[in-house]
């Protein structure tokens, strides 16, 4: 079938089971070919092909509402709703989003990106539906990994208590980005392997008779349907105790089974959970055999071999630099422990976990728990390192304020993926942490300019004993500088003068130091003597150096790959105001007060002037303005 000609899902209603299976094969082939060029979340999407087809066949989108938890598994949904012809722009600047996007299609009714949100959103939708006396189905699709998130439990509790009609699809592939952990994961494993996977008619009747009016007829139909007896499982006690009707587990790649059970779920009253067992990467062997989460999300790859097409990398990743230093420090200090909320692979903590299994804790998708657990460890003299992506740290804001910072507990926070992350877009950009951490008392915020300084900040952080210490580091690879001895302590709040300022100064931190240095070099060839300051301590500021530069009337340009509102430059402006300085020439470059869309990081940075050319232009504008002011005074 020509998938590029699909306009909406209505065509599927005319297809028989064989044609639906052929459609599934075509979609798999398309996904593999397409993502081999663009990269993307290929593993999750190959696992939900039949499920997504069955959902669109059974229900009527957009009247009926699909909510894709996390949203990375929505590619098949996008194809069936008329967006296959945009897949060559997938995750590119201005192109097709890798997650559901309301402005992209009327079929994307709720935007996702972080996990465990779908059930709460669905809860709100069914309440609104019933208040307005409307008639449509609400179907959240949530994975077994996302179901471990605390927010999902809160929603299950409320939905079960309300008893309103809703169909929850539990997409159980036994594999999130990293192996699932926790008691609920063990419950699901028992359900998958239970003897009651082979059900008797008596047990099926017990479930189906909860369905009003049509219960008797459906029981007879189920008896005649191939394999239906073994797929309606009574022993979903956990969900039933919460007030849900439980169906499953069923084979998530058997269209007949899925369609039959969706029809049963449609006729039931009250909340229903349909437990669908799928295989992540289904239909593409390299992805099917993946046990580490490598094929969860990828860059371009060769279809024939399953090998990734990698850009030339001459340096280890920032995550590796941090985790290797953590290993070195933990070898010498048994009080150091590592905590991650379901990101051991991305944060490069697998070696630590192997070397120190009793001091490594993957708590699952539980950022709030991870943060307060770190606080608890700190009260007992341990030295916890919380490795967490910037975008996920915002989920633990109250715990940072109430449990960590308020008590001045010694928790080292490794803020991974700080700054722009590119293709994953709005929901994953690490651009808010400076703004929301800046306002919390007792918090130290840092960011290294290179690998050596990263190691030095790690040493400094674990030596610091007066409260929490955050180290930000970006996605991607370091600069490749030689890793010299790293036991040097950096005085708290001390910046580094890399180039002495004369005409103007660029004050920045992290990766943008390199942009500043290149801009300063170019400006020097044009006769401008511009200094570069490494503001490795974002909080506290180096007040001594700031006083000095301001008194010398040196124009200041702050540059940051983060939000201007509440950001580093805003802190410098606040310092100027607090100290009653007037007539200070200061400008800021950074990100505006908006959500930043997907695309390559260099393209996004360039569009906001966070580039060598952007810095050069702003410095020239500042100096020209200073000359005009000077001339006026004369």
Swiss-Prot record:
Cofactor note: Binds 1 Mg(2+) ion per subunit. Binds 1 thiamine pyrophosphate per subunit.
Catalyzed reactions: D-glyceraldehyde 3-phosphate + pyruvate + H(+) = 1-deoxy-D-xylulose 5-phosphate + CO2
UniProt pathway: Metabolic intermediate biosynthesis; 1-deoxy-D-xylulose 5-phosphate biosynthesis; 1-deoxy-D-xylulose 5-phosphate from D-glyceraldehyde 3-phosphate and pyruvate: step 1/1
EC number: 2.2.1.7
Source superkingdom: Bacteria
Binding site for Mg(2+): 144, 173
SUPFAM superfamilies (alphabetical): Thiamin diphosphate-binding fold (THDP-binding), TK C-terminal domain-like
Primary enzyme class: transferase
GO CC, alphabetical: cytosol
A Pfam family this chain is assigned to: Transket_pyr
GO biological process, any: 1-deoxy-D-xylulose 5-phosphate biosynthetic process
Job of this protein: Catalyzes the acyloin condensation reaction between C atoms 2 and 3 of pyruvate and glyceraldehyde 3-phosphate to yield 1-deoxy-D-xylulose-5-phosphate (DXP).
Xref: PANTHER family: 1-D-DEOXYXYLULOSE 5-PHOSPHATE SYNTHASE-RELATED (PTHR43322), 1-DEOXY-D-XYLULOSE-5-PHOSPHATE SYNTHASE, CHLOROPLASTIC (PTHR43322:SF5)
Record protein name field: 1-deoxy-D-xylulose-5-phosphate synthase
